[in-house]
Amino acid sequence: MRNALAAVITGLMAVSMAGCGEGEGEGDDAFTVGLLLPSSAVPRWERFDKPMIEKRVKALCPDCKVAYANAADDATIQRQQMNSLITRGARAIIVDAVDVKALRSSVQAADRAHVPVVAYDRLAEGPVSGFVSFDGAQVGRLQGKALLKAMGDKAKQRRIVMMNGDPVSPNTAWYRKGARSVLDDKVTIRKEYANLEWRTDIARGNMTAAISDLGPGRIDGVLAANDAIASGVISALKSAGVSPLLPVTGQGADLDAVQRIVKGEQTMTVYKSFRQEADVAASMAVALGHGRSVHAIATTTVDSPTTQDVPAVLLTPVPVTAGTIERTLVRDEVYSIHEICPANLRSACDRAGLTGPTTKDTKETKEKEKVKGGDPGGVPARAGVARHLQAVRRRPGAPGRGTATPGR
């Protein structure tokens, strides 16, 4: 069994070497940054987060390398991957924990070996040195507000089903708390489910059970914690013949969810800028690898069940509806209109106002704007993450220094 597990770990561990050249002031001291992501089933991790983190590490530390591994939703494999990075001499590790409690022993082992750990998206237990995520309570509030708006003026008489995330994830409670702060006393929550591993098939089964227990005519909306869960909910509604479909929320800005929004099947999603999160994580890891504090990067502190006052950056999530896809996801180059609008969705895209330039035109426009000194897609052109974080601190409603307790 150990040999088989070692083979899996070796197979999953991919090392990409950053090139040489002038960096952005972090020096030329070469070291390894470990990057451990939780899943290959969720598209964002390997399509967006991995290359963006690698690119930012290279910009900050040209002679550094990134050692990457994906846990494929297996907490045991992730612990072994982390222990391997420690043994191989990684000087800092970025990790999005499959199971925040199960990873505690590996975080403690890293601490004993003087290897700082940056918790990414989910706050791992144990002595982590930094944390970057999005304000989970605000994610839930955005979902709750969108659901109330979609149900209309008579929302107080409406009955909803809450489809929460994986109970193992601390963010699940965080999102739920934010949503309940908006929904309580305004709707009746008829059923509430935990969806293990955020899986679409489990969400479909739970929604099918809710329809069977309550009757399709006695549900007026569904608070789905993320886009994978929303997919299962919508599939169950279709199978039950519910028409028109009910308002259903989401989170993650998955491409198939964006297309469901265009078609009118999903009410909204919540976009969390992969670029911003990746930039902060890479900046923290490189600073820690050079033996520096991350307090200059952090904008707040958070507490886990094991560790208090973890330096953190909690970024601002953005709601996305059919009417805002172009100025959020397309503008940030998450997806092109060509990707969102294949031939079979052209009419729906026209109705949603997605009639902008082609991918080629968009890229040319972006390059022209970068030459002029601006980048509409997130972090300003030629500006480091430090300047971006200063802007975050100045932004109205941005988290200040204090204590927040995360909970997906």
Question: For the regions a protein language model found, what residue spans apply to each?
Answer:
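N-terminal export and membrane-targeting signals
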Residues: 1-10
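C-terminal motif of bacterial Sec signal peptides marking the signal peptidase cleavage site
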Residues: 15-19
